[in-house]
């Protein structure tokens, strides 16, 4: 299986004046096409920091992050942004949808950043994916008019609309009750499997983690046996 993402010897140190904190230490990780990986670990173990680095939203203090054979940390912000838009989808615990835009407009947004995609095409693709997450009756609703589970479905649709090869998800069901979390995760799994998208998910929920192909435990910034 080919590697979509490869991180080697990742170290992250936050420097705040006199105090410096090493958050990640010598981490390696390879994600191959279509696989589902769950990262678990106690609060403060570095899970979100790692996801940020892997998604090119921040740079490691040392080490390398390769996405589709290209070294992210040698790129400038514009180049990293283009790589994110082309290859990655992001889902967060709190949906990060834009309050003043409808479901369709929120989902179409990543496509509208691509000059080759017309507004009409972006809108149609947004409608198609919103249909596949069961929100055909909520297309013109704004986030404030949707339930928590529905908002998370919109966020999933937005992450998948560009057909990314990898979804980075930080507690994607963390603010939902048990039933909603199961249903939203079920939907996410079904779509990523149909679309052959890999999934790297941070979760506190070991039951959810058990559904992934591979589980990784982060403790104090390094891997431990799960
Ligand atoms: N920008 C920053 N500047 C300084 N320290 C930071 C910064 N971001 C995170 N940290 C510190 O890095 C450590 C790891 O944080 P991180 O958010 O990655 O943990 P986490 O495992 O995702 O925790 P949680 O499960 O609570 O979300 C924490 O001690 C945090 O205070």
From Swiss-Prot:
Annotated positions binding ATP: 41-48
ATP-binding is among the record's keywords: yes
Enzyme class: translocase
Annotated ABC transporter domain residues: 5-226
Location in the cell: Cell inner membrane
One Pfam family it belongs to: ABC_tran
InterPro entries recorded: AAA+_ATPase, ABC_transporter-like_ATP-bd, ABC_transporter-like_CS, ABC_transpr_LolD-like, LolD_lipo_ATP-bd, MacB-like_ATP-bd, P-loop_NTPase
Main location class: membrane
Gene Ontology biological-process entries: lipoprotein localization to outer membrane; protein localization to outer membrane
GO terms, molecular function: ATP binding; ATP hydrolysis activity; transmembrane transporter activity
Entry's Gene Ontology cellular component terms: plasma membrane
Keyword Lipid biosynthesis among UniProt keywords: no
The EC number(s) this enzyme carries: 7.6.2.-
Signal peptide limits: none
Membrane topology, record value: Peripheral membrane protein
UniProt keyword annotations, A-Z: ATP-binding, Cell inner membrane, Cell membrane, Membrane, Nucleotide-binding, Translocase, Transport
Superkingdom of the source species: Bacteria
Similarity comment: family membership: Belongs to the ABC transporter superfamily. Lipoprotein translocase (TC 3.A.1.125) family.
Role played: Part of the ABC transporter complex LolCDE involved in the translocation of mature outer membrane-directed lipoproteins, from the inner membrane to the periplasmic chaperone, LolA. Responsible for the formation of the LolA-lipoprotein complex in an ATP-dependent manner.
NCBIfam families associated with the record: LolD_lipo_ex
Subunit structure, as described in the record: The complex is composed of two ATP-binding proteins (LolD) and two transmembrane proteins (LolC and LolE).
Listed name of the protein: Lipoprotein-releasing system ATP-binding protein LolD
Source species: Psychrobacter cryohalolentis (strain ATCC BAA-1226 / DSM 17306 / VKM B-2378 / K5)
């Amino acid at each position: 299986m080919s590697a979509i993402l490869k991180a080697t010897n990742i170290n992250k140190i936050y420097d705040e004046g006199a105090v410096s904190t090493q958050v990640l230490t010598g981490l390696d990780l390879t994600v191959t096409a279509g696989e589902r990986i769950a990262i678990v670990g106690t609060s403060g173990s570095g899970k979100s920091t790692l996801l940020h680095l892997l998604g090119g939203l921040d740079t490691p203090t040392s080490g390398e992050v390769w996405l589709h054979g290209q070294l992210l940390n040698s790129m400038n912000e514009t180049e990293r942004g283009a790589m994110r838009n082309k290859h990655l989808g992001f889902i967060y615990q709190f949906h990060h949808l834009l309050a003043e835009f409808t479901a369709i407009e929120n989902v179409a947004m990543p496509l509208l950043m691509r000059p080759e995609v017309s507004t009409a095409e972006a809108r149609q693709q947004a409608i198609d994916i919103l249909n596949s997450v069961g929100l055909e009756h909520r297309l013109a609703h704004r986030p404030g008019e949707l339930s928590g589970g529905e908002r998370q479905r919109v966020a999933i649709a937005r992450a998948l609309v560009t057909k990314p090869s990898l979804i980075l998800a930080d507690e994607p069901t963390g603010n939902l009750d048990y039933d909603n979390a199961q249903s939203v995760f079920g939907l996410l799994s079904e779509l990523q499997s149909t679309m052959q998208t890999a999934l790297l998910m941070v979760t506190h929920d070991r039951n959810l983690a058990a559904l992934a192909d591979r589980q990784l435990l982060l403790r104090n910034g390094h891997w431990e046996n799960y």
